[in-house]
């Protein structure tokens, strides 16, 4: 039996929608990253973008376990000497762009490289329950039903 290698022309991409309300950030990000890469498919090929298009709604209503909501710190650098900045998860989730928490969590679970940028383009995160992708007829994925630990009380 020969090793199967998927060609980019043979890729069948589906649209998947995930409601992030009440879900634990890391567990959600892990499932989304696997879907984006296509590792849930039997014809997965590492060097081909064979994953699905993923829409995450209600990203502002995600949960952290333990005391991470107050204590988790996100760092970024301005590019100037001594320009390291930090923000807590609470500050970001209550701020103007709360969807960045989910975006960063997923982004940091994907391998770097040229394919990374293409895969990340298949992720759409929205802070409310509205999204402009109804025409794609996305299939709902119930992450909460996959494992009871995926939902925080």
UniProtKB/Swiss-Prot annotation:
GO CC, alphabetical: cytosolic large ribosomal subunit
Keywords noted in UniProt: Ribonucleoprotein, Ribosomal protein
GO terms under biological process: negative regulation of translation; translation
GO molecular-function terms, A-Z: mRNA binding; structural constituent of ribosome
InterPro entries according to UniProt: Ribosomal_uL13, Ribosomal_uL13_bac-type, Ribosomal_uL13_sf
Subunit structure, interactors included: Part of the 50S ribosomal subunit.
Family: Belongs to the universal ribosomal protein uL13 family.
Protein name: Large ribosomal subunit protein uL13
Organism, scientific name: Methylobacterium sp. (strain 4-46)
Classification of source organism: Bacteria, Pseudomonadati, Pseudomonadota, Alphaproteobacteria, Hyphomicrobiales
């Amino acid at each position: 039996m020969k090793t199967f290698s998927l060609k980019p022309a043979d890729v069948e991409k589906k649209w998947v929608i995930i409601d992030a309300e009440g879900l634990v950030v890391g567990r959600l990000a892990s499932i989304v990253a696997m879907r984006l890469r296509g590792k849930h498919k039997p014809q997965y090929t590492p060097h081909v973008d064979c994953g699905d298009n993923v829409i995450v709604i209600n990203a502002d209503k995600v949960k952290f376990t333990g005391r991470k909501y107050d204590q988790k710190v996100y760092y970024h650098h301005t590019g100037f000497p001594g320009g390291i900045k930090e923000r807590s998860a609470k500050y970001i989730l209550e701020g103007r762009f709360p969807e960045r928490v989910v975006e960063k969590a997923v982004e940091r679970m994907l391998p770097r490289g040229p394919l990374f940028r293409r895969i990340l383009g298949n992720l759409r995160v929205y802070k409310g329950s509205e999204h402009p992708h109804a025409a794609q007829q996305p299939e709902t994925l119930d992450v909460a039903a996959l494992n009871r630990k995926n939902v925080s009380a």
